[in-house]
């Protein structure tokens, strides 16, 4: 498959794509990667690293067209390709596009993928690599623009949104296997894992159960995991600080198992007031993004754990996800762990209900849902 990968500045896409390429090589698959930004810098030897977006738009467009021309020529006979580029830029020139329709058509992409990550991480990377004054709000707006522009591009080039995907970069563990499978294993089933988040952050046993569920699904399917972007936890911490009257203080953002990278040596510092300024954006984009992740999946598999006191861990978010999947004709599978029986709103919309993750996996395997794998299990 031929894929175009987009994402705002600050996503650190190049090492991610190289990791996908290396992973493909380990599976015996040829996967070629093109980094449009690197090709542009190679052409513009007078431009210092990190400064290319400060060029006049006319020269920037000329450099980009020259770079894409090289990519089109170089990738013509290659089977599996990832082109690392952007759909939009929000820079000192304002908002502007980063592609030309004629060249995207000439690339003949099969899918367009927009890569996303937690906004405080994107903001941190952006300011580490570039001399620019961008707020968390700026980064939130840019991410939404990048997603929309990529989706519109897929509709224009592919004729529908069926080849458009939102993929999180992954912070606890990167999602190189997900992108590899999208490009090199396109026939694998695509799954949206659904589980409670906000209500269980202080329940380590339940978190471990959820992590096991997520890991098992990702072993056998292409998964689009909503827990890989966990900005709601950041907002909850900011709100708690604000209630203490500490809106001008800083938050040290530490990793969490839902999406935090345990490899970062120092926590990222963000101002409480700046997080509160994007409260509506965080909630709105979670709502939009999670539904899009369901739309791009073949089926939803939801884990309903039993919380202390025998209470079903069925959050309002999980209920809405199940209903959205049902109304959009997705296969709906529920792993129901509580002793209390599920309500008709679950039983009447679920394709099948299981009592354990192992039972669900056995059923999926018996139905031939597990994709074919190579000798390495991928």
Tell where the protein language model's regions lie, with residue ranges.
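Residue-level signature of transmembrane alpha-helix interfaces in integral membrane proteins
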Residues: 53, 100, 236-238
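Glycine-rich phosphate-binding loop used to anchor ATP phosphates in small-molecule kinases
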Residues: 59-106, 293, 313-314
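Conserved NTP-binding/hydrolysis module of P-loop NTPases
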Residues: 44-54
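Conserved catalytic or regulatory cores that recognize and/or transform ribose-phosphate-containing ligands
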Residues: 1-29, 34-42, 58-59, 89-92, ...
């Amino acid at each position: 498959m031929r894929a175009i990968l987009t994402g705002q500045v600050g996503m650190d896409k190049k090492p991610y794509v190289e990791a996908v390429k290396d992973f493909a090589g380990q599976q015996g698959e040829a996967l070629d990667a093109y980094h449009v930004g690197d090709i542009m810098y190679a052409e513009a030897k007078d431009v210092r690293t990190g400064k290319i977006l400060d060029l006049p738009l006319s020269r920037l467009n000329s450099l980009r067209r020259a770079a894409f021309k090289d990519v089109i020529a170089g990738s013509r006979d290659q089977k599996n390709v990832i082109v690392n580029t952007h759909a939009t830029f929000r820079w000192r020139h304002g908002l502007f596009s980063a592609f030309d329709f004629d060249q995207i058509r000439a690339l003949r992409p099969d899918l367009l993928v927009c890569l996303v990550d937690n906004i405080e991480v994107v903001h941190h990377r952006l300011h580490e690599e570039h001399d620019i004054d961008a707020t968390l709000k700026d980064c939130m707006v840019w991410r939404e623009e990048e997603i929309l522009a990529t989706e519109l591009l897929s509709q224009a080039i592919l004729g529908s949104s069926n080849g458009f995907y939102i993929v999180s970069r992954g912070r606890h563990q990167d999602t190189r296997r997900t992108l590899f499978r999208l490009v090199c294993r396109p026939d694998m089933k695509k799954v949206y894992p659904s589980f409670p988040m906000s209500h269980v952050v202080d329940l380590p046993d339940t978190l471990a159960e959820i992590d096991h569920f997520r890991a098992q699904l990702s072993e056998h399917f292409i998964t689009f995991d909503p827990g890989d972007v966990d900005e709601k936890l950041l907002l909850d911490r900011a709100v708690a600080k604000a209630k203490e009257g500490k809106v001008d203080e800083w938050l040290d953002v530490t990793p969490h198992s839902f999406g935090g990278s345990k490899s970062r040596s120092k926590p990222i510092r963000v101002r409480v007031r700046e997080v509160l300024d994007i409260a509506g954006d965080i909630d709105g984009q979670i709502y939009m993004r999670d539904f899009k992740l369901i739309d791009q999946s073949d089926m939803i598999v939801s884990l309903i754990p039993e919380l202390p006191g025998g209470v079903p861990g069925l959050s309002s978010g999980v209920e809405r996800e199940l209903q959205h999947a049902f109304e959009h004709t997705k296969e709906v599978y529920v792993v129901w762990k509580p002793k209390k029986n599920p309500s008709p709103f679950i039983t009447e919309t679920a394709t099948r209900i299981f009592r354990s993750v192992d039972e669900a996996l056995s059923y999926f395997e018996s139905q031939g849902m597990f994709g074919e794998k190579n000798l390495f299990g991928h």
